[in-house]
Amino acid sequence: MRIIVDTNIIISAGLFPQSNVGKALAHIVKNHKLVLCQYTLDELKNVFKKKFPKRIEYFNKFVKKLKYELIDMDIKEYAKYPSIRDIDDIPLLANAIEAKADILITGDKDFDNIKIKTPQIIKPVEYIEKYMK
């Protein structure tokens, strides 16, 4: 399966690799195709610079070790995608749709009420229960 994850999933997995989220990301990388968009990587860099400035080198090594497919879609017409409360989340949703991801994993509640068939939008715990047991 093609699985795209949001920024917070990667941050949690990077900071806490033995956590459930860390184990889920490791499972995805081993058993599926992890898909990341350039928007997510840029957001990761910004978050680490602001919140974890002393761990930037660790972050860079962590991301370099991940096996993933990078997509860099220049999406300009956000109006054609389902609406979402936080407009900053539209690039992730749009990239997930355009990359034909099977699953989008996020803990962001803004994605809870989006009604689309593909990708299936699930929380990390749902991924663990459904695919890791």
Show the residue positions of the predicted features.
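Residues that mark the start of a beta-strand
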Residues: 1-2
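A secondary-structure boundary/capping signal
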Residues: 6-7, 37, 107, 124
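Alpha-helix capping/helix-boundary segments
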Residues: 9-10, 40, 92, 110-111, ...
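PIN/NYN-family metal-dependent endoribonuclease catalytic core
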Residues: 5, 15, 21-50
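Active-site neighborhoods of divalent-metal-dependent phosphate/nucleic-acid chemistry enzymes
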Residues: 69-103, 109
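Acidic, PIN/NYN-like endoribonuclease modules and their adjacent C-terminal/linker elements
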Residues: 82, 109-133
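Domain-scale selection of a single, long terminal region
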Residues: 42-76, 92
